[in-house]
């Protein structure tokens, strides 16, 4: 019995050891795309910070600032999780964007938008809404998550309008000027 318990504990410890880790930072005015060992592509917008950890049984990206467009390689044995402020996004293989600002007008909130496939969004552990039911999003849908982890309503979004920054574009609609200016300044481009 002791041997079986020891093997079980050892197996669990082995599963929890990362097989790959990396940290990424893109300064204002720059963007870049990285490809992970599993084939997943991460397109990081300007002023973005993220940590990547791949395990034997799961894949995780923690965004501490900024915006990333994910093109996740399918792997049913290793789900892909994005941990971002008040939210946790879980996918199998899809294309979606996650935005999080630690400071500024939208401080502490997250926005998830799906270009292809589907994702599940839930409040992060430790938030007031961690036990609430997750939301399932499909292509052409988006939602925001409050700093307390409360999921906002699902809204329609044109898949082609997701991650416009990759095309050198930025779009504002019904956005207060202060919010627009703060978001524009992160691009590092002159406003004239």
PLM regions and their residue ranges:
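A short, charged helix-loop
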Residues: 145-165
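Short hydrophobic/aromatic-rich motifs at helix boundaries and adjacent loops
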Residues: 4, 20-23, 40, 67, ...
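Single-pass transmembrane signal-anchor helices and their membrane-water interface zones
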Residues: 1-19
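Short amphipathic alpha-helical segments, especially helix-boundary/capping motifs
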Residues: 7-8, 24-26, 92, 154-160
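Secondary-structure transition/turn motif
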Residues: 2, 117, 156-157
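Short, small/hydrophobic-biased targeting/export segments
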Residues: 20-147
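Short acidic/polar beta-strand-loop edge motifs in secreted extracellular
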Residues: 22-23, 98-102, 161-179
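Amphipathic, non-transmembrane alpha-helical segments in extracytoplasmic/periplasmic proteins
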Residues: 39, 171-192
């Amino acid at each position: 019995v002791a041997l079986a318990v020891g093997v079980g504990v050892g197996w669990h410890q082995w599963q929890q050891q990362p097989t790959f880790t990396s940290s990424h930072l893109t300064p204002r005015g720059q963007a870049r795309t990285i490809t992970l060992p599993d084939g997943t592509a991460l397109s990081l917008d300007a002023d973005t910070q993220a940590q990547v950890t791949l395990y034997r049984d799961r894949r995780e990206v923690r965004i501490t600032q900024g915006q990333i467009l994910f093109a996740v390689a399918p792997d049913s044995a290793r789900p892909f999780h994005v941990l971002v402020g008040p939210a946790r996004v879980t996918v199998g293989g899809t294309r979606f964007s996650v935005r999080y600002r630690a400071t500024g007008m939208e401080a502490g909130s997250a926005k998830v938008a799906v270009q292809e496939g589907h994702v599940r969004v839930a409040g992060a552990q430790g938030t007031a809404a961690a036990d609430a039911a997750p939301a399932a999003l499909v292509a052409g849908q988006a939602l925001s998550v409050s700093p307390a982890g409360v999921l906002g309503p699902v809204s329609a979004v044109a898949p082609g309008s997701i991650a416009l920054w990759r095309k050198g574009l930025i779009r504002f609609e019904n956005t207060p000027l202060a919010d627009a200016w703060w978001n524009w300044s992160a691009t590092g481009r002159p406003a004239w």
